[in-house]
Amino acid sequence: FGKGYETIEQIEKSDSTTKFHKSSFQLYPRFVWEVRPHLYTGPLFDINFSKSDDINPVMAEDPYFNKFKRDYVNIGVGGLIQYDTRNDVATPSSGMLLSAIAKVYGKYLGGAYNYEMFELEYRQFQQVFRPRSTLAWIAKTQIGVGNVPFTELPSFGSPFDLRGYYWGKYRDKTMAYGILEYRHMFGSVEKYKSGNFWAKCGFVGWVGMGTIGNAPIVDWNKWKFNYGVGLRIQMQPGKNFRLDV
């Protein structure tokens, strides 16, 4: 769909305008130590490879896409700091996460392009009504600075944030979104442990909004509103089957 609202909103989805094939690989180790109770920090490394082919005619003429090669390797180093009080990383029902990540990519590290990525994230979880009933709210922003390749631009619209949009449709140098989500599992903890089928089932409902812009400022006047519901089946503790609409 291109980069930025002006380009994205003008392009209709079709095989001849938006379809392309992306092959990618990423090695992203992070080394984290707890320096104080709930406070974690450490270095990280990112090596990622991306290749784009079967390019559609519209994409082949996109000026931002054509600034970069069709395949490249990016190599970056950085650090992270997190304050994490969640009672469970996979399926938390209480606590919070505050996270800040900074990464620097460069030709001097062996990569193809010079750019920086910054990320701030806030997650809060609160039990409501009864056990296995959780209210969660999330806010996140990513900022890219420098010569950020098209496939690495900050974006929203994926199974991990604002669900329902085509993956990677909304991308630019800066991205921000917020989500309010209610999660409900049927039955009690005791019924789940006893193997009761309905106690393994639940649902979610969410509302959210996101925007993009040219770094470091997002376009505060062009928010995309998002909402939906979903089914959850807990296959094992901390592991859910998800179906969202």
Give the ranges of each region predicted by the language model:
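Transmembrane beta-barrel strands of outer-membrane/channel proteins
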Residues: 1-11, 43-49, 96-104, 120, ...
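Short sequence motifs at beta-strands and strand-loop junctions characteristic
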Residues: 19-23, 69-73, 90-92, 112-114, ...
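C-terminal outer-membrane beta-barrel translocator/porin domains of Gram-negative envelope proteins
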Residues: 78-82, 86-197
